[in-house]
Amino acid sequence: MFFKRLVAAGAALVVLAAAPATSQTRPPVRTDHHVHVHAPAIREILTAYCDSPGRISACDPAFVKPLTAKDLLADMDQTGVQTAWIMSTAYLAESPMMVPPLADAADRVHVANAFTVAIAAAHPERLVAFISVNPLAPEALAEIEAWKGEPFAKGLKLHLTNSGVDLRDPGQVRRLAAVFDAASDAGLTIMIHMRTRASDYGAQDVRVFVEQVLPHARGVPVVIAHSGGWGGLDANTWDALEAFRQSLATDHKRFPNLYFDLAQVFDADTPPGDRERLVDLMRRIGVDRFVPGSDWPFSGPLDAYLNDAMALLPLTSDEAEALRLRQVELKTGA
């Protein structure tokens, strides 16, 4: 009888050893590379922005919630996320979607950026601030220059959809390249939501970006938000990711500081076939180029995204652990 109990106990241990990693055994997410907290200067305009005739779609209810850094940190603590990159949403003030345009847009951008930097300064061990601009705004370069040397301003967030950037307009491409130059000069890591409003956005836009804009980042890291899309895995996102794969295929060491975040790219309902296809592309591009990101609060609770949904990706245990621990190294100064 005693022998039978030993055999049964041994079998149970084997089953436990073979089981997937649980929240108790998997490492915490070291960095969520993509979160937001609206500044008061932006919250004041959200109703007008969401009701604007210039909007191309309705605002997500989570977009207008008056959440604070305290809410973010509480969710990070609950989920086990150690640090987060907090993206300023100052660019909303200068969005062409805001109709009529704001008379105080440029001032509002600076105030909103200052708010984001102040949050990071108040929580330097947990939060990293990214200022933001509309790259087509006349004041964009001056706003970037204003934060040069500020120790708590570590990055620049660009949102091409919201800013109305057209990667097929040579003049706008040159202005975007100039913004990359300015960010590089200021030592700011760049986070770019590069999907545009073009209904056929995809490979042709990626090729323009890779050849005419990305080289202007020079040594600073560039993170492609939403893995080249704007959330989800539609035909445009697949086309963009495949174009990035092709651009890196001949020389994997090309653009060593290029990364892709996984913010809202998948969720618990993503079909298994799409998850498999995504992981296949991640491996062909280089799994080490992909980093955790949530798009909080638009992703919902961090635990559901970074723990539950991300665990459904068919990565090997080593790949999954490395992804959770991966953190893009920020520049330490201009």
Regions found by a protein language model. Give the residues of each.
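Catalytic pocket-lining loop regions of alpha/beta-barrel enzymes
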Residues: 154-155, 168-291
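Active-site gating/metal-coordination segments in enzymes
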Residues: 92-198, 204
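Conserved, mostly hydrophobic/aromatic
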Residues: 34, 76, 116, 156, ...
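Bacterial N-terminal signal peptides that target proteins for export
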Residues: 1-10
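Mid-to-C-terminal alpha-helical segments outside catalytic/metal-binding sites
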Residues: 3, 25-33, 37, 41-83, ...
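Active-site beta-loop-alpha junctions enriched in small/polar residues
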Residues: 36, 89, 132-136, 159-163, ...
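Divalent metal-dependent hydrolysis catalytic cores, especially in the metallo-beta-lactamase
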Residues: 51-67, 71-99, 126-132, 154-155, ...
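Short, acidic/polar
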Residues: 67-75, 138-148, 277
